[in-house]
From Swiss-Prot:
GO terms for molecular function: ATP binding; ligase activity, forming carbon-nitrogen bonds; tRNA binding. This is tRNA(Met) cytidine acetate ligase. It comes from Alkaliphilus metalliredigens (strain QYMF). HAMAP family: TmcAL (MF_01539). The lineage of its organism: Bacteria, Bacillati, Bacillota, Clostridia, Peptostreptococcales. Its EC number is 6.3.4.-.
Length: 424
């Protein structure tokens, strides 16, 4: 048995994800696959289109063997923290052999080199980074510019790279996530072997509904603007279409950030600037801007655009909104940063090969798998707080769902993992 790990959001699972899954199995020579997937809130600070169990079902129906939930604390965080949480779960399972991710270049050695610079933080890089931050440039862009400065002084030919290729690499979101995965593997001294495959066709933020392969961003934008699922049938597997169609017909989605907007804005309007300043990632006077914009806006997207600036990216503002909604406090983030254990494998969907992964992990490690929350007792306060946040995220996400059956709370206690029985 050779087990492949994937770190995913599947919002929703589309043909590009299917290509990534199939090619990842080939390149890593894996027999079994486990995906660590975000739950109801995502890395860009947005709610998922449909609930996590349906998205996990999409993955298993398409060939993933086991889907575990990435705890909300990590799922709705920076690329660095998101990667740290997901890689830590794969590490603690004790059985994952490989991790494969998509990148625009498909050049693992170049990505490793960038990860090494970020880990070691050479003086020249730190000086450049500080300079760009002082110019008011947002951290992600400032870091990319500092890396470009650093590599422009190096001979990149030994990595099969040119300065132009390195600049292109550092500007792409998918490459940045890949670099963070490699950093997390290195910092945790992981035995998991990394691979990357070149993304096929549509770019990460492409908004074009191209033939066959398109981005999740394009799919979500199309649904937001038209609500027409039939026009994207060419870009998603049949099983994804069926699941989305069933969910939409039952008023289970699609869910967008504005559906939670009034809840979030009402929370912010009840706060003082001093209270807003205590929220994680708020600083340097941003609390005043948030306070003013909340009282000038009646839609969440309008509010986020109002707050956004050269220094504060839209994604950062969206994540701040979700932290307010979910009451994510700094002490828990600090605990998670320093925790080497305490994570868990919340099972969302699996098949018979997924069951084999679980059994092997239970033999090789003490990593806990959760099928039913009611039957799991957290071993410490950190784990309890992580799980409580996941439950709270589901309860609040449910408020955006029009279907009365799902809009009630406690869905985490009532919903069982999806099981796909393989034909023998």
């Amino acid at each position: 048995m050779r087990i492949l790990g994937l770190i995913t959001e599947y919002n929703p699972f589309h043909n590009g994800h299917l290509h990534h899954l199939q090619e990842s199995k080939k390149i890593s020579k894996s027999t079994h696959t486990v995906a660590v997937m975000s739950g109801h809130f995502l890395q860009r600070g947005e709610p998922a289109l449909i609930h996590k169990w349906a998205r996990a079902q999409m993955a298993v129906d398409a060939g993933v063997d086991l889907v575990l939930e990435l705890p909300t604390l990590y799922a709705c965080a920076s690329a660095e923290f998101f990667s740290h949480g997901a890689v830590s779960i794969l590490n603690q399972m004790g059985v994952v052999d490989a991790l494969c991710f998509g990148s625009e270049l498909g050049h693992i050695e170049a990505l490793k080199q960038v990860a090494t610079v970020l880990i070691n933080s050479p003086e020249s890089f730190e000086i450049s980074l500080k300079k760009y931050l002082q110019e008011g440039i947002a951290f992600p862009k400032a870091r990319s510019k500092a890396l470009i400065d650093h590599f422009s002084l190096e001979d990149l030919s030994s990595y099969g790279m040119t300065t132009e290729k390195m600049i292109a690499l550092l500007k792409n979101p998918n490459n940045i996530l890949g670099i963070e995965y490699l950093k997390a593997l290195a910092l945790t001294k992981s035995k998991i072997q990394p691979y990357t495959i070149t993304r096929k066709a549509a770019a990460y933020h492409s908004t074009e509904l191209t033939l066959n392969i398109t981005s999740a961003t394009a799919i979500r934008n199309h649904l937001f603007n038209t609500g027409n699922l039939n026009e994207m049938i060419h870009a998603i597997p049949p099983s994804t279409y069926e699941i989305l169609s069933t969910c939409f017909n039952k008023d289970g989605g699609p869910i967008f950030a504005n559906d939670l907007g009034l809840t979030i804005l009402s929370m912010i309007r009840r706060m003082t600037p001093q209270e807003i300043a205590k929220i994680l990632d708020v600083g340097e006077g941003l609390e005043n801007r948030i306070f003013q914009c909340a009282n000038q806006s009646n839609r969440l997207d309008e509010f986020c655009q109002c707050v956004k600036s050269k220094r504060y990216t839209l994604t950062r503002i969206q994540r701040i909104c979700m932290r307010i909604l979910l009451d994510i406090q700094f002490p828990l983030m600090n605990q998670a940063t320093h925790a080497s254990t305490g994570l868990y494998g919340r099972i969302l969907a699996f098949n018979d090969r997924g069951r084999e992964i679980i059994k092997l992990a239970q033999k090789k490690s003490s990593f806990p798998f959760i099928t039913k929350i009611n039957q799991y007792t957290p071993p410490n306060s950190f784990t309890k707080n992580l799980l409580d946040l996941d439950i709270r995220a589901t309860n609040l996400y449910a408020l955006a769902v029009k279907n009365n059956a799902f809009s009630k709370g406690e869905q985490d206690h009532l919903t069982s993992p999806y099981y796909r029985k393989e034909l023998t």
